[in-house]
C-alpha cells in the first residue's frame, strides 16, 4: 500500500464488523481521524453530533435499520454539502443514477481495494467546493 499522510475526519458506515475494523485500522495508520457506525440509525446519530468535523463519509449501501440511501438523504438534510463515497458489492444502475442525482460522484466496490479507498477519500477531502452555490465538491 502506498504511503501517504491523511488529513481530515472520516465517518465509516459499515455493518460488517471485520470490514469496519480493517478500514478503520488502515485509515488510522494513514493519519486520519475516524468515526464509525455499524447501522443506519447509528450513522445518523454520529453524523448529527460531528457533522462540522466530518470531511467525508464512507457509506455502505446495505445497512440494517436504515438503508444507505435513507442515511444519505438524512445526511443531506443535515448538511447539503456532505461528501460521500458509496461502498457496495452491487448497485443497480437506477440506484446509482439516483445517488448521482443528489451529488454522489464517488463509488468504491466491495470487497475493498484499500489503496483505492484511501486515494478516493483523500481526493474528495482535497477537492475544492464549487463556487456556483451548489455546495458540492468540484470533481
Positions of PLM-derived features:
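The feature encodes the CheY-like receiver
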Residues: 20, 64, 92
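Active-site residues of response regulator receiver
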Residues: 60, 88
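Non-catalytic signal-transmission and effector/linker regions of two-component phosphorelay proteins
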Residues: 1-11, 24, 45-48, 53, ...
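Conserved acidic carboxylate
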Residues: 14
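Charged docking surfaces used in two-component/phosphorelay signaling
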Residues: 21-29
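Short hydrophobic/Thr-rich beta-strand motif most characteristic of the beta2 strand and flanking loop
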Residues: 31-39, 46, 108
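Residue-level signal for the "D+5" position in two-component response regulator receiver
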Residues: 36, 63-66
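Acidic catalytic/metal-coordinating carboxylates
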Residues: 39-42, 67-70
Amino acid at each position: 500500500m502506498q504511503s501517504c499522510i491523511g488529513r481530515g475526519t472520516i465517518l465509516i458506515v459499515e455493518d460488517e464488523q471485520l470490514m469496519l475494523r480493517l478500514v478503520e485500522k488502515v485509515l488510522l495508520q494513514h493519519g486520519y481521524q475516524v468515526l464509525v457506525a455499524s447501522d443506519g440509525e447509528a450513522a445518523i446519530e454520529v453524523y448529527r453530533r460531528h457533522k462540522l468535523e466530518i470531511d467525508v463519509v464512507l457509506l455502505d449501501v446495505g445497512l440494517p435499520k436504515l438503508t444507505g440511501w435513507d442515511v444519505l438523504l438524512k445526511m443531506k438534510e443535515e448538511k447539503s454539502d456532505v461528501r460521500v463515497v458509496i461502498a457496495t458489492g452491487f448497485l443497480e444502475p437506477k440506484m446509482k443514477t439516483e445517488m448521482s442525482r443528489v451529488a454522489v460522484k464517488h463509488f468504491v466496490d466491495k470487497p475493498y481495494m484499500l489503496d483505492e479507498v484511501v486515494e478516493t477519500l483523500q481526493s474528495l477531502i482535497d477537492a475544492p467546493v464549487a463556487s456556483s452555490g451548489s455546495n458540492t465538491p468540484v470533481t
